[in-house]
Amino acid sequence: MNTLVDLNDKVIRGYLISLVGEEGLRMIEEMPEGEVTDEEIAAKTGVLLNTVRRTLFILYENKFAICRRERDSNSGWLTYLWHLDFSDVEHQLMREKKKLLRNLKTRLEFEENNVFYVCPQGCVRLLFDEATETEFLCPMCGEDLVYYDNSRFVSALKKRVDALSSV
């Protein structure tokens, strides 16, 4: 396999599992060297052909798989030859980290700048404005809404943002 990456690294493993799942990771680990067809990958790895194709497509979308088409001169059929290239994985992980950090900061700002009310039965969590529209009654079950102190959640978000910012 043409990876140029340590698949035992827990961050890289976790990222690949989030992209292609456990079966996809198994396919990556057992994929033959060089250019191979999806059928050859399925035969060598024991992963179902549909899973192999789905995994290859996801890897291709994320620029971790390279595909070359070859036309059979006799039948006219196209054959797709695949190989993997994880040389850009560090850059991809940095982009994912920045996106996650941006989303966490947006959520933190939302949580800090709003007041929430919840149904004691767990039906809904509403913004103050939404709670006033329902006269502080749960729109699902009719229970009185109660103030929700989100300070623990805000604190957890801040810790997560700080941890990601320092890496």
UniProtKB/Swiss-Prot annotation:
Pfam families on file: TFIIE_alpha
GO MF assignments: DNA binding
Domain of life: Archaea
Alphabetized PROSITE patterns for the sequence: HTH_TFE_IIE
Disulphide-bridged cysteine pairs: none
Domain named HTH TFE/IIEalpha-type: residues: 8-90
Gene Ontology biological-process entries: regulation of DNA-templated transcription; transcription initiation at RNA polymerase II promoter
Gene3D superfamilies: Winged helix-like DNA-binding domain superfamily/Winged helix DNA-binding domain
Entry keywords, A to Z: DNA-binding, Transcription, Transcription regulation
Record has Nuclease as a keyword: no
InterPro entries: TF_E_archaea (IPR016481), TFE (IPR039997), TFIIE/TFIIEa_HTH (IPR017919), TFIIE_asu (IPR002853), TFIIEa/SarR/Rpc3_HTH_dom (IPR024550), WH-like_DNA-bd_sf (IPR036388), WH_DNA-bd_sf (IPR036390)
Domain free text: The winged helix domain is involved in binding to DNA in the preinitiation complex.
Family statement: Belongs to the TFE family.
Known function: Transcription factor that plays a role in the activation of archaeal genes transcribed by RNA polymerase. Facilitates transcription initiation by enhancing TATA-box recognition by TATA-box-binding protein (Tbp), and transcription factor B (Tfb) and RNA polymerase recruitment. Not absolutely required for transcription in vitro, but particularly important in cases where Tbp or Tfb function is not optimal. It dynamically alters the nucleic acid-binding properties of RNA polymerases by stabilizing the initiation complex and destabilizing elongation complexes.
Oligomer status and interactors: Monomer. Interaction with RNA polymerase subunits RpoF and RpoE is necessary for Tfe stimulatory transcription activity. Able to interact with Tbp and RNA polymerase in the absence of DNA promoter. Interacts both with the preinitiation and elongation complexes.
Name of the featured protein: Transcription factor E
Organism: Methanosarcina acetivorans (strain ATCC 35395 / DSM 2834 / JCM 12185 / C2A)
Record gene name: tfe
